[in-house]
UniProtKB/Swiss-Prot annotation:
Protein name stated in the entry: Teashirt homolog 1
PROSITE patterns on file: ZINC_FINGER_C2H2_1, ZINC_FINGER_C2H2_2
Phenotype upon gene inactivation: Normal Mendelian ratio at birth, but none of the mutant animals survive beyond P0. Newborn mutant mice exhibit a strong defect of the soft palate, vertebral malformations in the cervical and thoracic regions of the axial skeleton and malformations in the middle ear components.
Biased composition (Basic and acidic residues): 269-284, 496-534, 653-671, 681-714
Quaternary structure annotation from Swiss-Prot or TrEMBL: Interacts (via homeobox domain) with APBB1 (via PID domain 1).
Predominant cellular place of this UniProt entry's protein: nucleus
Species: Mus musculus (Mouse)
InterPro entries: HD, Teashirt_fam, Znf_C2H2_type
One GO biological process term: regulation of gene expression
Length: 1084
């Protein structure tokens, strides 16, 4: 049919100028109205084509866009809301249109008018219309009614068979007209019926461009995959055929969204698995060869980024493939939230995917189910407004660049979040740095899959998970909004409670009695806290009375702690570390070494957020304290009486004689010890896990009864900003308070040290302070409970210890270590911890764990920095002495900082490696690996340093023909300079033999020399170095009773100044080398 052929191109209306479309439509309408003799089938065609044109209209005609700037409209909630609303009703208007278009069923204008009014009423009864829209309703409804009636009257009635069809058409269009007029935000309606008709039809195209399958959600979602159709269709090539529409390949029906198309294909069976053959045909629609090649190169990758299954994250090459996948797997039924889900498959093997879901999903609900209800309702709410599951792969589903930025800013806390510990970061660089420092990038998958398997799923929650797979956020602490997503997960249960605002706590109180009583009890104690301040000032920790108040039967505290310790030990010995308290040992030690900066840093982290927002105030505490741990995977034990504690102490330390005041502290220490090690959790039986999961409330109240009293003193002396923080911790959290037990600043110091001391006892190791390389946190742990098993050697003044006291413990009520068997004063312990960080750590096996975790070797721990230690090095071999005594000489770079002996050896080796040619020129040849190894062994220089030195010398010689000790190499008449005595030589062999006289041995003997001989030869140098390092600490520059001797020529001088002048003028030595070549002699 010629008519059909003419109209075919109109499907891609987005490519056709709007004016042409309108003109064509006007002609078509006039032809119809003029009563052309069309048979019924042709009139059907007219209707179908009109609707196709309408549906294919470009999106520029959207009613929203006419009111607002188009780009701005994309991101604006107003446009979202109105679009949503329009598509909320699209199903009904489409059904009406289809009914009225059916040529067999005769529809009457009166009926359609009634339908129009119904559509009005429905559209504007929606609560989400703004007041602006309501105003428009008054003006526009009148206009559109006149408009509609005008159309009715202008409809001619030709011969009977045609009249039915054309009336149907007109009825449909009038319904459309009024509907779109009312929803449009433009009050301009044209007077002439024909142009008005075109405008309305264009506007309706936008109105109907929404999907009815998502009508369940009136609120807009931030990250909506349904926005796919807003992508620029030219960018993705054949992904979108026609005017950015999803079309069925079989019947060419156009749909606005992929889901609609999928549903259609499923219902009609319009799909085949062997649909790849048609992909090649699509490319022919591209007009320019350049574009075609562009599409062939990039189109597929882009398509795969966009064509993702929203449920499982798999990519597809064409829409049809994706639709077939959706139909076969029924995944389109499982995406009710309009949220993109990250491809979990990329992060973990599919076998572990379920474990991850289990892990991140809620489990261990409150016995009364209160938290579950609250959480479910909140999560339902959040699913519409927040989407923490953002991965870089999802950005193609967003609307455009501007709104993506806006959404990213709004959700930055969830997007830039460490999946292991939940800490949020401001920039990607910070997150990357955090992952590298803590080793979390290694642990995300392994720990998740390990720990995920043992969690027990709540059935209600399981249903939720079926449709919303969660990303692998393993036992994390999330910022407030996302924490609601996994409300009852073990860590989550703590966090979600912490996060609740006071009102929510009150709600909980009113909830079912079992939970209510426990919570109320806690709340009362906390409220009393300030009044109790006077009497309880002496008891900042748990007392026997507190323990007696709430003995709740249950887990054997001894057994659980033994499990914890034994499994931690076995893990440490087997080299498969799994630290609960800190995700990696690096994390445990990443703190500034000095006390003062640490204290200010902690305060800024913890106190400031509480001013900023009460909701976020806890995140800092969590990140410092609990967060690295699946803290409450093994909650504090129930059984908490003094006899149990005595047995525990007896078993762990073999001592029973412990002061009464220590017991509460031990109780307090043991709980976090138990809490911080997931290792124990892994080795415990599943039934136990279930049991702990089912009684969080009990534990909460148990641990808090004493804790409330303990914290009462805290509130009094913490800075203002911290008070709300502390109160909230006390009210909401089951066991956070135990870990944050002394004062807000060092709240994250305690747990590891307790476990550390237990391990010391079990491993039979002597506890020594940690080495500087592992440094800061470990030292702080020692500070917080530094009862050491071996005598201490305080070398710093006690003043320093007092300073630390003042920073860390305002009440001077120190926590007591579990292994405390000899009661020593704290101050000496503190002094020891601070002053002698140079000996080996008691937990060297822990430092070994670092190697396993990150593959990085821990740096050398033997670099004495204080004078007192330097004497210890006397008996060691020369290399050690040199390494330790001259950190300055270990600097690579300017040669003046090198040990001159090392330079002589290197220069001699280099000169001996030069080969003389027949013409008398010298050719540089590289030092062999053997020689390098010998030099390295003798000097202690690393192979890298030696290679760099050689490379540098060669570079200088090639570039300028000379270097410090060798000139004119390129001319064939080289001059070798001796660094020590400034003498010059013409041949390499004489130069080498001269250097060997300085060294006292020949280069060939380098590898054979015994250490003792080297020591003798180098003792002068080491002594000089010692003098150099002691210089500033020693006596005044010129002692009256000494003379100075030049080592090179043995002349003596009355003052240092004279020797320096002599060295500079006679030997050409630089000032930095003076001390090395000067020996101080006692005057006789």
């Amino acid at each position: 049919m010629p008519r059909r052929k003419q109209q075919a191109p109109r499907r891609s209306a987005a490519y056709v100028p709007e004016e042409e479309l309108k003109a064509a439509e006007i002609d078509e309408e006039h032809a119809e109205d003029g009563g052309l003799s069309l048979d019924i089938q042709e009139s059907e065609f007219a209707c179908n084509e009109e609707t196709e044109i309408k549906e294919a209209q470009s999106y520029q005609n959207s009613p929203v866009s006419t009111a607002t700037n188009q780009d701005a409209g994309y991101g604006s909630p107003f446009s979202e809301g109105s679009d949503q609303l329009a598509h909320f009703k699209s199903s009904s208007s489409r059904e009406e249109k289809e009914e009225s278009q059916c040529p067999d069923s005769v529809s009457y204008p009166q009926d359609s008018l009634a339908q129009i009014k119904a559509v009005y009423a429905n559209l504007f009864s929606e609560s989400c219309w703004s007041s602006l829209a309501l105003d428009l309703k008054k003006s526009n409804s009148a206009t559109s009614n006149n408009d509609a009636s005008q159309k009715e009257s202008s409809t001619p009635t030709p011969t009977p068979p045609t009249s039915t069809a054309s009336t149907a058409c007109t009825t449909a269009t009038t319904a459309i007209t009024s509907c779109s007029t009312s929803t449009s935000h433009s009050s301009t309606t044209s007077n002439s019926s024909s142009s008005g008709y075109d405008w309305h039809q264009a506007a309706l195209a936008k109105t109907l461009q929404q999907t009815s399958s998502y009508g369940l959600l009136p609120e807009p979602s931030l990250f909506s995959t349904v926005q796919l159709y807003r992508q620029n269709n030219k960018l993705y090539g054949s992904v979108f055929t026609g005017a950015s529409k999803f079309r069925c390949k079989d019947c060419s029906a156009a749909y606005d969204t992929l889901v609609e198309l999928t549903v259609h294909m499923n219902e009609t069976g319009h799909y085949r698995d062997d649909n790849r053959d048609k992909d090649s045909e699509k490319t022919k629609r591209w007009s320019k060869p350049r574009k075609r090649s562009l599409m062939e190169m990039e189109g597929k990758e882009d398509a795969q980024k966009v064509l993702k299954c929203m449920y499982c994250g798999h990519s597809f090459e064409s829409l049809q493939d994706l639709s077939v996948h959706m139909i076969k797997t029924k995944h389109y039924q499982k995406v009710p939230l309009k949220e993109p889900v990250p491809a979990i498959t990329k992060l973990v093997p599919s076998t572990k995917k379920r474990a991850l879901q289990d892990l991140a999903s809620p489990c261990s609900p409150e016995p009364t189910g209160v938290a579950t209800e609250v959480a479910l309702s909140e999560s339902a709410k959040d699913q519409k407004t927040a989407n923490p599951y953002v991965t870089p792969n999802n950005r193609y589903g967003y609307q455009n660049g501007a709104s993506y930025t806006w959404q990213f800013e709004a959700r930055k806390a969830q997007i830039l979040k460490c999946m292991e510990c939940g800490s949020s970061h401001d920039t990607l660089q910070q997150l990357t740095a955090h992952m590298m420092v803590t080793g979390h990038f290694l642990k995300v998958t392994t720990s998740a899959s390990k720990k995920g398997k043992q969690l027990v799923l709540d059935p209600v929650v399981e249903e939720k998970i079926q449709s919303i797979p969660l990303p692998p956020t393993t036992h994390t602490r999330l910022p407030a909004s996302s924490i609601k997503k996994q409300p009852d997960s073990p860590a989550g249960s703590v966090a979600s409670e912490e996060k609740k605002e006071p009102e929510k706590e009150k709600e909980k109180e009113k909830a079912p009695p079992a939970a209510g009583d426990a919570e109320r009890k806690i709340k009362e104690e906390t409220e009393d806290a300030t009044e109790k301040f006077e009497p309880t000032a002496l008891y900042q920790y748990l007392r026997e009375e507190d323990l007696d108040d709430s003995p709740k039967g249950g887990v054997d505290i001894l057994k659980s702690l033994e499990n914890t310790v034994s499994t931690a030990i076995s893990k440490a010995q087997n080299g498969a570390p799994s630290w609960g308290g800190y995700p990696s040992i690096h994390a445990a030690y990443q703190l500034p070494g000095t006390v003062k900066p640490l204290q200010s840093a902690v305060q800024s982290v913890q106190i400031q957020p509480s001013y900023a927002s009460s909701v976020k105030s806890l995140s800092s505490t969590e990140h410092n304290a609990l967060l690295h741990s699946p803290g409450s995977l093994t909650p504090p034990p129930h059984k908490s009486n003094v006899s149990a504690m005595e047995e525990l102490v007896e078993k762990v330390t073999g001592k029973v004689s412990i002061k009464k005041e220590e017991r509460p502290t031990e109780k307090e220490k043991s709980s976090p010890v138990k809490a911080i090690s997931p290792v124990a959790k892994e080795n415990k039986d599943l039934p136990k896990t279930e049991e702990t999961g089912s009684k969080p409330q009990k534990k909460g109240s148990d641990s808090e009864t004493g804790k409330a009293k303990k914290e009462s003193t805290l509130d009094a002396h913490t800075p203002n900003g911290t008070e709300p923080l502390k109160a909230k911790v006390t009210n909401g959290c089951g066991h956070l308070g135990i870990i944050t037990d002394h004062s807000p600043e060092p709240s994250f110091i305690n747990p590891l040290s307790a476990l550390q001391s237990i391990m010391n006892t079990h491993l039979g190791k002597v506890s020594k302070p940690v080495s500087p390389s592992l440094d800061p946190l470990a030292m702080l742990y020692k500070i917080s409970n530094s009862m050491l098993d071996k005598p201490v050697y305080p070398t710093t003044p006690a003043k320093q210890a007092d300073a630390i006291d003042r920073y860390y413990y305002e009440n001077s009520d120190q926590p007591i270590d579990l292994t405390k068997s000899k009661n020593k004063p704290l101050v000496s312990g503190v002094a020891d911890a601070v002053s002698s960080p140079l000996r080996e750590s008691a937990l060297m096996d822990i430092s070994d764990m670092v190697k396993n975790l990150t593959g990085r070797l821990t740096p050398k721990s033997s670099t004495p920095s204080t004078v007192s230690e330097k004497s210890d090095a006397d008996g060691s071999s020369f290399e050690e002495a040199l390494d330790e005594l001259s950190p300055v000489h270990k600097r690579k770079g300017r040669q003046s900082n090198w040990n001159p002996q090392h330079l002589l050896i290197l220069q001699a080796q280099f000169a001996s490696s030069l080969r003389e040619t027949a013409e008398g020129k010298y050719i540089m040849s590289d030092l062999g690996p053997q020689e390098r190894v010998h030099i390295s062994k003798f000097t202690g220089l690393s192979m890298t340093t030696i290679s760099h030195w050689l490379a540098n010398v060669k570079y200088q010689l090639r570039r300028t023909g000379g270097t410090k000790f060798l000139k004119n190499l390129d001319t064939g008449h080289p001059v070798f300079f001796c660094n020590d005595c400034a003498s010059q030589f013409r041949t390499a062999s004489t130069y080498v033999s001269h250097l060997e006289t300085h060294l006292g041995f020949s280069l060939k003997d380098l590898s054979k020399l015994p250490l003792s001989q080297i020591q003798e030869q180098q003792s002068v140098v080491s002594k000089a170095l010692t003098n150099k390092t002691l210089g500033p600490l020693g006596s005044s520059e010129e002692d009256l009773g000494s003379t100075f001797q030049c080592k090179l020529c043995n002349r003596t001088f009355a003052s240092k100044h004279a020797v320096k002048l002599h060295l500079s003028k006679t030997h050409g030595k630089s000032p930095e080398d003076h001390l090395i070549y000067v020996t101080e002699l006692e005057k006789q």
